[in-house]
Amino acid sequence: MTAAQGNSNETLFSSYKMGRFDLSHRVVLAPMTRCRALNGVPNAALAEYYAQRTTPGGFLISEGTMVSPGSAGFPHVPGIYSDEQVEAWKQVVEAVHAKGGFIFCQLWHVGRASHAVYQPNGGSPISSTNKPISENRWRVLLPDGSHVKYPKPRALEASEIPRVVEDYCLSALNAIRAGFDGIEIHGAHGYLIDQFLKDGINDRTDQYGGSIANRCRFLKQVVEGVVSAIGASKVGVRVSPAIDHLDATDSDPLSLGLAVVGMLNKLQGVNGSKLAYLHVTQPRYHAYGQTESGRQGSDEEEAKLMKSLRMAYNGTFMSSGGFNKELGMQAVQQGDADLVSYGRLFIANPDLVSRFKIDGELNKYNRKTFYTQDPVVGYTDYPFLAPFSRL
């Protein structure tokens, strides 16, 4: 059965074999920054949060997790680059495994979407460019709760890039040490890898800029390095070719997306082993009329983008972005996605899978509590339809 044909017998609640992982359903916890890891170290609150959202055979992706001390752009986001962090993550992973779930760690470097307060010695954030994120729409959240404009970044020298690639590789190894089932490379949403991919940001004239192939080079090196470190079956990749978050615009999102897919397919062929999945965020033009930076779009443009990437990719395809139950069911039944990840709905509904199955009423999420440090309110206190049990 091809992706284009779909399978009307498959639903969000059908089992799925994602490489070496036997999943009991297609509903995935999307990676979401929550700012509860005080001083970058996971704690019992994170273990409770992820355990609440675990189902037997379910698949979870952790929040964006720092690969180095200077890779953060939010307060109190977890890291995976120190022994202390690795040990602290073990309680989170063990809580998920105790419920019968699988969990990948999302490896994250925000690049220019940072501030001196998050940088060692108060330095400038790094990027593909020295152009700052525009101040007309975007602000960076500081530890004191204030929002200020993004500073001018420092463009990485080509000679520095291998060290950044190594940060991803070491973090991947650390994630496996912590017990994670694998990792997801965050190449989306205007963060460091996306700052190389998008021609609206990347103004380099060396081997990392200009052509699409050059702009894909950094992602290619990260994927190659991480696959070499932990194996392809434990590696997922997330991209968002048509998402304009943090000024991450591209003149031809479809061609960029297809170039990334082609590069990943080629790597899989050379390696002889498939990646765990490709995770693509779609723009939802039909829901919002435009992407975050104001670029207009249409249903047809969105459908062409997602279907083209789905058909081109040789492996498990995961979609995210504004899905409800009905849209998720449609995506699976029509063959547009193997898996669907949910974000905000999962924040407010830790038992989202159960609610979807019985068409239960959904809790409303509270945006004001998305990025606080409270270990309970807006984090682990959303009600269940039935009492929660960790076992």
Swiss-Prot record:
Pathway field: Lipid metabolism; oxylipin biosynthesis
Main localisation: other
Reactions that this protein is recorded to catalyse: (1S,2S)-OPC-8 + NADP(+) = (9S,13S,15Z)-12-oxophyto-10,15-dienoate + NADPH + H(+)
Gene Ontology CC: peroxisome
Disruption phenotype: Male sterility. Fertility can be restored by exogenous jasmonate but not by 12-oxophytodienoic acid. Large petals with altered vein patterning.
UniProt binding sites for FMN: 31-33, 64, 106, 238, 320-322, 343-344
Annotated family: Belongs to the NADH:flavin oxidoreductase/NADH oxidase family.
Function description: Specifically cleaves olefinic bonds in cyclic enones. Involved in the biosynthesis of jasmonic acid (JA) and perhaps in biosynthesis or metabolism of other oxylipin signaling moleclules. Required for the spatial and temporal regulation of JA levels during dehiscence of anthers, promoting the stomium degeneration program. In vitro, reduces 9S,13S-12-oxophytodienoic acid (9S,13S-OPDA) and 9R,13R-OPDA to 9S,13S-OPC-8:0 and 9R,13R-OPC-8:0, respectively. Can detoxify the explosive 2,4,6-trinitrotoluene (TNT) in vitro by catalyzing its nitroreduction to form hydroxylamino-dinitrotoluene (HADNT).
Protein name: 12-oxophytodienoate reductase 3
Species this protein is from: Arabidopsis thaliana (Mouse-ear cress)
Encoding gene per record: OPR3
